[in-house]
Amino acid sequence: MLKPSVTSAPTADMATLTVVQPLTLDRDVARAIELLEKLQESGEVPVHKLQSLKKVLQSEFCTAIREVYQYMHETITVNGCPEFRARATAKATVAAFAASEGHSHPRVVELPKTDEGLGFNVMGGKEQNSPIYISRIIPGGVAERHGGLKRGDQLLSVNGVSVEGEHHEKAVELLKAAKDSVKLVVRYTPKVLEEMEARFEKLRTARRRQQQQLLIQQQQQQQQQPQQNHMS
């Protein structure tokens, strides 16, 4: 005869499964490297495969991805709901790998916010159909003294808020609103900045030519006016 199943009350061990554990990416990577070294000593796996994987885990790329992932994950407000935790994890993953596409690895740069400003200028934005870039590092300013930013860095986020595809003013407002310090996620793409600056220079040159032509036309009209008055 079948006995009815009985569901036991949650135990302390089961309850711990719902506790949100902090990220331990540094420790996890270190543990993975340690296990790879033990496997290498055992000789069970070809050494060249283990060395390749170990090289990836110790690379600057992996470190950069880990830093961006952890930063994005920690700056997203997450409550106890598993759905929100999943969204935060997904958003952090997308931010890390999307930032690394193309030219260079993403970097997290933290600068102190003082009365003298942050020491750099930005250009570009959605209204100019371009990303937002660090266009100038002010000599002697905070950014130059810190040494973390480069001219040609694309600005990806400010204090956890993405500025990709945003207007120029949005990035400026976020930078101004930061207090005490500002955390930036950037990636170095100088060629794109050079192309953007070249495009802006062409627009400025075309605008100057139009202004010069307009000025010449006005001068010609002014010269013709006295002659017409004299003839009349």
Curated annotation (Swiss-Prot):
Protein's cellular compartments: Cell membrane; Basolateral cell membrane; Cell junction; Postsynaptic density membrane
Domain of life of the native organism: Eukaryota
Tissue: Ubiquitously expressed in brain and detected in lung, liver and testis (at protein level). Expression was detected only in brain.
Keywords of this entry: Cell junction, Cell membrane, Exocytosis, Membrane, Postsynaptic cell membrane, Protein transport, Synapse, Tight junction, Transport
Alphabetical list of CDD domains matching this protein: PDZ_Lin-7-like
Gene Ontology biological process terms, A to Z: exocytosis; inner ear development; neurotransmitter secretion; protein transport; regulation of synaptic assembly at neuromuscular junction; synaptic vesicle transport
PROSITE patterns: L27, PDZ
Single GO MF annotation: PDZ domain binding
Cited function: Plays a role in establishing and maintaining the asymmetric distribution of channels and receptors at the plasma membrane of polarized cells. Forms membrane-associated multiprotein complexes that may regulate delivery and recycling of proteins to the correct membrane domains. The tripartite complex composed of LIN7 (LIN7A, LIN7B or LIN7C), CASK and APBA1 associates with the motor protein KIF17 to transport vesicles containing N-methyl-D-aspartate (NMDA) receptor subunit NR2B along microtubules.
UniProt comment concerning the protein's domains: The kinase interacting site is required for proper delivery of ERBB2 to the basolateral membrane.
Subunit note: Forms a complex with CASK and CASKIN1. Component of the brain-specific heterotrimeric complex (LIN-10-LIN-2-LIN-7 complex) composed of at least APBA1, CASK, and LIN7, which associates with the motor protein KIF17 to transport vesicles along microtubules. Can also interact with other modular proteins containing protein-protein interaction domains like PALS1, PALS2, MPP7, DLG1, DLG2 and DLG3 through its L27 domain. Interacts with DLG4 and GRIN2B as well as CDH1 and CTNNB1, the channels KCNJ12/Kir2.2, KCNJ4/Kir2.3 and probably KCNJ2/Kir2.1 and SLC6A12/BGT-1 via its PDZ domain.
Name by which UniProt lists this protein: Protein lin-7 homolog A
The organism of origin for this protein: Rattus norvegicus
Organism taxonomic ancestry: Eukaryota, Metazoa, Chordata, Craniata, Vertebrata
Gene encoding the protein: Lin7a
